[in-house]
């Protein structure tokens, strides 16, 4: 325990130093609301900065729980919980045809303590008692910890969490008698249900139920506790309900979170980076829904469930699952690519951008967004890093089909054209955009490496390498430009304002315009308090571009600058006003905790900081970027390339670093100059 405290103390000092450096770099000062706890959770001790509101999403295989919570100036909480049931669908099929119901505090059954009504969200009622929230804790389960009674002798832990594998969310009140006399606690028995219209319900009418568990009267002696629960569930068979066991559901949720956190552990001197990495792993991995079409990773955000997108799932998060060590994550990745592959066709019509409603229909409302480049990029990266030849063979036809589709859309200027990009017309993208072309470039590079592993004829793999080289030259010629004085890229042919996606060449290993691009990214024209503006001068931001940029700047070797901005961004997302995960966008969606962005956050470390670039089923190039003020860093329990191994980086004398690879009882240490690449074979 003493060792753990010393480690936490050391990390806190280094984090403080990083904060000071960030302020010197021109980043805004942050006034953190939350603090990291020794068990890896974060806590907010309610202070005088009230009122405050925030929202968070938590997911299981059959449910997603979105909670908006606020604390008023008197310390009382106000909660709104929306429960989404992804596999309970209405007709007609579309992206948002799942059912979801919102429950407010005034719909809860009343709780009494010694015959006095416990007020959760308002201070009315003479002689009644109020639940004053003292702190809120997040770590896969949300806890609101408060006190009630004149001397605060009654403590109440109000926790909310989703079931791991059932269409069920639970709100649990654990009431403890800390006084010297017995108390009597009672909760009203309640069971309310609504049933959807049969004519518009898919498969069967759906029933949503709010019911109590362990209601009634309980006598608590000093030191004793009781748990009272409210359950929110969906069923197509309301007459055949099984009893709900809140304790078992909570235990399962804790175990699932621990299972997600166990592999792929980041160790750096910066406790904020370590903790946000762990939180991002939770959000990226929990948001996988068990559908009739198999496991489907879904973005969430009250809108996107039991559905996959070429960008969110195929491009952003599935390549992360190849490193994650999570079996469900891997299944969701393979299923994602399988579902997209089902839309391949001999006419080379585009694969739809999104497959929705448990795989029953699709959405392609924005036309070709460069989706084939997204899919080929993600699938080839995943196949190499996962390291299983049978899986790669299944993905190869999809990869080659998407590459051929893109080749057929090469323009006279030798760049790939598309109808739009992943922003689907929200901002102009021209006839050919930088993102699609960079993704296609990396896909060609990875496909050449993958094809060699699959013993594809050299004529084909050499052709991919040649096409990649030609495309790289075309990207420089077509997109290379001086914008606002920065030698960087234009996003499309007639673009003359800086765009966030100028980071894409760096993230894909194209470093021709590194200096000017990094200067532009971190200039006041693009960098805002919340990361990169989508376009210079606009308030709109999408975290995905910031996450790509931070990875790309690390890959380009501007390590200390990248770490300053990564520390700033991570602090804001983990400990600031809206926590604890990366978000989708603002103002659209009001910074929803869409889950694939958390996968992108983790990839900043696997591909950026540790510089892992898959080259084969059991090999990778490693170009670690150890910050100048760190002595060491490690990524332990990496599950990739068909192996489990640790990657430990440490500073040596003479500007060199040691790269230690530990696999089982074997280990090998490479000593290289900082910035050099190690070719690792496991």
PLM ranges: what are they?
Residues 1-24:
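Bacterial Sec-dependent N-terminal signal peptides
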Residues 2, 22-275, 558, 562, ...:
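Terminal accessory carbohydrate-recognition/targeting modules of carbohydrate-active enzymes
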Residues 219-246, 302-307, 352-374, 404-469, ...:
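The feature captures the catalytic groove of carbohydrate-active enzymes
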Residues 258-393, 420-423, 494-507, 521-522, ...:
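Substrate-binding groove/exosite segments of carbohydrate-active enzymes
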Residues 277, 281-284, 461-479, 569:
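Short amphipathic alpha-helical coiled-coil/interface segments
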Residues 286-290, 342, 346, 381-384, ...:
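Conserved helix-loop functional segments at active or binding sites
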Residues 288-291, 344-349, 407-417, 477-484, ...:
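Proline-centered turn/helix-capping motifs that create local helix->coil transitions or kinks
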Residues 309-324, 329-338, 393, 397-400, ...:
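Active-site core of glycosidic bond-cleaving carbohydrate-active enzymes
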């Amino acid at each position: 325990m003493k060792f753990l405290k010393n480690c936490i103390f050391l990390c806190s000092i280094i984090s403080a130093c990083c904060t000071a450096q960030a302020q010197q770099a021109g980043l805004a000062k942050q006034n953190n609301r939350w603090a990291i706890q020794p068990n890896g959770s974060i806590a907010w001790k309610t202070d005088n900065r009230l009122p405050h509101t925030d929202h968070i999403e938590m997911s299981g295989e059959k449910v997603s729980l979105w909670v908006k919570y606020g604390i008023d100036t008197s310390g009382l909480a106000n909660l709104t919980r929306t429960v989404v049931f992804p596999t309970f669908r209405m007709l007609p099929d579309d992206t948002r045809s799942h059912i979801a119901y919102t429950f407010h505090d005034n719909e809860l059954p009343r709780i009494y303590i010694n015959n006095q009504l416990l007020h959760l969200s308002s201070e009315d009622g003479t002689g009644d008692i109020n639940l004053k929230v003292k702190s809120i804790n997040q770590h896969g389960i949300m806890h609101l910890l408060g006190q009630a009674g004149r001397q605060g002798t009654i403590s109440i832990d109000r926790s909310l969490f989703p079931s791991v594998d059932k269409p069920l969310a639970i709100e649990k009140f654990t009431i403890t008698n800390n006084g010297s006399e017995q108390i009597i606690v009672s909760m009203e028995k309640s069971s309310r249900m609504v049933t959807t219209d049969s004519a518009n319900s898919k498969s069967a009418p759906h029933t949503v139920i709010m019911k109590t568990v362990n209601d009634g009267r309980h006598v608590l002696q000093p030191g004793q506790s009781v748990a009272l629960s409210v359950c929110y569930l969906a069923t197509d068979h309301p007459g055949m309900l099984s009893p709900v066991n809140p304790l078992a559901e909570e235990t399962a949720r804790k175990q699932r979170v621990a299972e997600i956190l166990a592999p792929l552990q980041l160790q750096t001197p910066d406790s904020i980076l370590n903790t946000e990495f762990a939180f991002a792993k939770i959000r990226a991995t929990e948001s996988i829904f068990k559908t009739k079409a198999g496991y489907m990773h879904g973005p969430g955000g009250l809108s996107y469930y039991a559905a996959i997108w070429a960008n969110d799932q195929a491009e952003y998060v599935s390549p992360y699952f190849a490193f994650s060590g999570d079996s469900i994550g891997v299944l969701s990745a393979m299923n994602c690519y399988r579902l997209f592959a089902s839309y391949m066709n001999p006419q080379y019509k585009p694969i739809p951008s999104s497959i929705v409603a448990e795989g029953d229909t699709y959405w392609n409302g924005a036309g070709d967004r460069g989706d084939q480049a997204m899919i080929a990029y993600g699938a080839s990266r995943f196949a190499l890093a996962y390291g299983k030849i049978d899986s790669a063979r299944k993905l190869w036809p999809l990869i080659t089909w998407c590459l051929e589709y893109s080749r057929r859309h090469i323009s006279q200027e030798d760049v790939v054209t598309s109808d739009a990009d992943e922003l689907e017309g929200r901002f102009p993208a021209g006839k050919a955009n930088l993102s699609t072309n960079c993704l296609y470039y990396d896909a060609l590079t990875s496909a050449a490496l993958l094809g060699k592993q699959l013993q594809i004829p050299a004529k084909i793999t050499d052709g991919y390498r040649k096409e990649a080289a030609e495309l790289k030259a075309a990207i420089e010629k077509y997109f290379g430009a001086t914008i606002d004085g920065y030698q960087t890229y234009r996003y499309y042919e007639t673009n003359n304002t800086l765009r966030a996606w100028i980071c894409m060449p760096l993230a894909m290993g194209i470093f021709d315009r590194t200096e000017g691009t990094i200067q532009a990214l971190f200039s006041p024209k693009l960098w805002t308090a919340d990361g990169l503006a989508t376009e210079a001068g606009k308030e709109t931001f999408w975290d995905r571009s910031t996450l790509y940029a931070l990875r790309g700047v690390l890959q380009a070797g501007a390590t200390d600058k990248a770490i300053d901005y990564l520390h700033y961004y991570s602090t804001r997302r983990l400990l600031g006003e809206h926590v604890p995960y990366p978000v989708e966008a603002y103002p659209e969606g009001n910074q929803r905790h869409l889950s694939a962005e958390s996968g992108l956050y983790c990839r900043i470390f696997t591909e950026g900081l540790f510089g892992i670039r898959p080259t084969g089923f059991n090999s990778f190039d490693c170009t670690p970027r150890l910050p100048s003020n760190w002595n060491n860093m490690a990524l332990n329990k990496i599950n990739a390339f068909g192996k489990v191994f640790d990657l430990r980086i440490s500073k040596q004398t003479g500007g060199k670093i040691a790269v230690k690879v530990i696999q089982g009882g074997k280990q090998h240490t490479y000593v290289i100059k900082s910035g050099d690449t190690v070719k690792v074979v496991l």
